[in-house]
Amino acid sequence: MELRPRLGATCLLGFSFLLLVTSSHGPNGLGKGFGDHIHWRTLEDGKKEAAASGLPLMVIIHKSWCGACKALKPKFAESTEISELSHNFVMVNLEDEEEPKDEDFSPDGGYIPRILFLDPSGKVRPEIINENGNPSYKYFYISAEQVVQGMKEAQERLTGDAFREKHLEDEL
């Protein structure tokens, strides 16, 4: 008879844990530890939105098993500055098998995590790098401060009049 209450409590505890784990991915499940308060898109949806809105894309490529990726997640998610700057980008979060096979998404190698910036047309802009990082791994960011600096550089280069003028020159 004592087994029944324990079994019920164990089932309730298991269900609660399952609910906690599944709800930690947020309403759209795209945060993956990088912040459910950020409006994440898939790459396909992000490219469409960027083309329609004129906003650049910020793409994070990471793996669920990667130690450096796991270390970056809380720093990224807890940064109010990243959260604020994210409103000026279409944010894309690619994990594991979601990583694109296109070589443009690994301009200097397939290491992880990588953060790339794309212009509103969906073209990877390899000139936007982590200026304060390892020169052998130009798209590897280890701190929120480095990410913020990259976002500010991308915003400066890929939005506003400067980008439009440069983009028009390229088309002519």
Swiss-Prot record:
Gene Ontology terms: biological process: negative regulation of endoplasmic reticulum stress-induced intrinsic apoptotic signaling pathway
Motif (Prevents secretion from ER): 169-172
Main location: endoplasmic reticulum
Reactions listed under catalytic activity: [protein]-disulfide + 2 glutathione = [protein]-dithiol + glutathione disulfide
Pfam families attached to this UniProt entry: Thioredoxin_7
GO molecular function: protein-disulfide reductase (glutathione) activity
Matches recorded under SUPFAM superfamilies: Thioredoxin-like
Disulfide bond residue pairs: C66-C69
Cellular localization per UniProt: Endoplasmic reticulum lumen
Signal peptide: 1-26
EC number per UniProt: 1.8.4.2
PANTHER family listed in its UniProt record: ANTERIOR GRADIENT PROTEIN-RELATED, THIOREDOXIN DOMAIN-CONTAINING PROTEIN 12
Function comment: Protein-disulfide reductase of the endoplasmic reticulum that promotes disulfide bond formation in client proteins through its thiol-disulfide oxidase activity.
Stated name of the protein: Thioredoxin domain-containing protein 12
Gene name of the record: TXNDC12
